[in-house]
């Protein structure tokens, strides 16, 4: 974490520059769940109800509406080095959890195009993760 002296806020800076690999398959698309970490929460419509499920070691939840999993290359972690610095800019370690929320199983949808019902599902997931913290 580093202090931005223009905005007077702390910002998170990825020390590895956050280069994303050029993948031939989209790891966020349904059917490619094995390309990501196991989900900690997947919302699934079953029997007319929204159920909260999670992946197991040898089983990935299918037909999910929203999926949450730990990032493969997290920017923050609960295991961090205590590296404070004053020069050239003030910095301190960033500590926390880095999750990926896949808001829709539809590859072409964006946050501005998903339905109100799907937005509601995303907010349920965010609320769940905040309560967990």
Regions found by a protein language model. Give the residues of each.
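Active-site microenvironments that recognize anionic phosphate/pyrophosphate groups
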Residues: 1-133
